[in-house]
Curated annotation (Swiss-Prot):
This is Uncharacterized GPI-anchored protein At5g19240. It is a lipid-anchor; GPI-anchor. It comes from Arabidopsis thaliana (Mouse-ear cress). A lipid is attached at residue 169 (GPI-anchor amidated serine). Residues 1-25 form the signal peptide. Belongs to the UPF0277 family.
Length: 199
């Protein structure tokens, strides 16, 4: 009997979240999960996702924020690209990773928790959303975050478009640093010209 790809992903996620807690470090778990994502994409003839450091930063920040929230069987969600992901303090989390909404609006943030007392958590709804989006060729990169207790998992999917690249925005950098630098340079030139006028 053939096993469906959805069941394969569901099984792998269940095993991963059930077994990794006492054995794997967060980094090992994130790397393993990333490998599972790419094996799945290869099985449906899609290119591998590339690791995106900024998406990983954001996933880690979201996980840190979720870490103290209670986890139930129904906890978890997926953002809709182009909308506010509904994560408290989201603008602050973006700023910590030197990102802004212009470079994240086409991406997707998936979050799920697996209660510690469940040996095989029910991840079917998360697996359905994850599988649907892993099948989407517009997603080209990812970042994964897992909390230190192994309860929360956040996956950030990125695109290769300006609106979903999760790249450190040059406009953002110029917006703050460039404005200050330009203002200081303008004041310097103005003061230099003022001094030469009075000499």
């Amino acid at each position: 009997m053939a096993i469906s790809k959805l069941h394969l992903v569901l099984f792998l996620l269940s095993v991963f979240l059930s077994l990794h807690r006492p054995v794997l470090s967060n980094t090992d778990g994130e790397n393993l999960l990333f490998t599972v994502f790419n094996q799945y994409r290869e099985s449906v003839n899609l290119t591998n996702l590339k690791k995106n450091k900024n998406a990983e930063c954001l996933a880690d920040e979201v996980v840190d924020q979720l870490q103290n929230q209670p986890c139930t069987n129904t906890t978890g969600s997926a953002s809709v690209p182009g909308t506010d992901p509904g994560i408290p303090n989201f603008p602050n989390l973006l700023a910590k990773c030197r990102l802004n909404t212009n470079v994240t609006r086409d991406g997707l943030i998936l979050q799920v928790c697996a209660p510690k007392h469940h040996s095989t958590p029910d991840l079917s709804s998360f697996a359905n959303v994850l599988t649907k989006n892993l099948n989407d060729s517009k997603f080209t990169g990812a970042g994964v975050g897992i909390d230190s207790d192994g309860i929360w998992l956040v996956t950030v999917l990125t695109t290769n478009t300006p609106g979903g690249s999760y790249s450190n925005s040059g406009a953002f950098a110029f917006g703050v640093n460039g404005l200050v630098s330009s203002s200081l340079m303008f004041l310097h030139v103005l003061s230099h010209n003022s001094l030469s006028l009075f000499s």
